[in-house]
Amino acid sequence: MRIISARSGAKSIIAEKTFTGTVHQDPVITDQDDIKINTVIFTPCSRTYWHFHDNGQILQVFRGKGYVCGKDGVPRVITEGDTVYIEPGERHWHGGTQDSLMGHTAITLGGTTWLEEVSEADYAAAADAD
C-alpha cells in the first residue's frame, strides 16, 4: 500500500509537447511502468494529440465540459461526473470544449503512443456535436 500526499503548493506542469493549447498537468503517480495517474485541466479549445494506450485508459471528469473522440471519429461531449473507459489500443483524443475548461483525472494503463495533432477540422466537428 502507498499513500500519495497531495502536491501542496507545487506548480502544475504546462504540457506542450503532445497538446494543443494550454493544458495544466499535476502528476499523481508517474514512477510505475504499468500505471500513470495525472490530474489534467484543459483550457477552452485545448486538447491532446491523437494517441493510444497499450492497456487502456480511464478518464474521470471532475470539472467543466469536454470532448472525447475515439476510433469511430465521432466526438462525444463529456461533463462533470462522467467516466470514460478507452479500450487498449484505441486511437483517441480528449480536451476542453470551445467555451469550457475540462478537468479530469487520467488513469493510464501501460504505455502511451503519441500520434499526430488533432486537426482544426476534427476539432470543429466536435463543436458541431456539442
Language-model-detected regions and their locations in the chain:
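Short beta-strand His + acidic residue motifs that chelate non-heme Fe in jelly-roll/DSBH
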Residues: 48-50, 68-69, 91-98
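Conserved strand-loop elements at the edges of beta-sheets that form or border functional pockets
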Residues: 30, 52, 60, 78-80, ...
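Short acidic-glycine-tyrosine-enriched beta hairpin
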Residues: 72-89
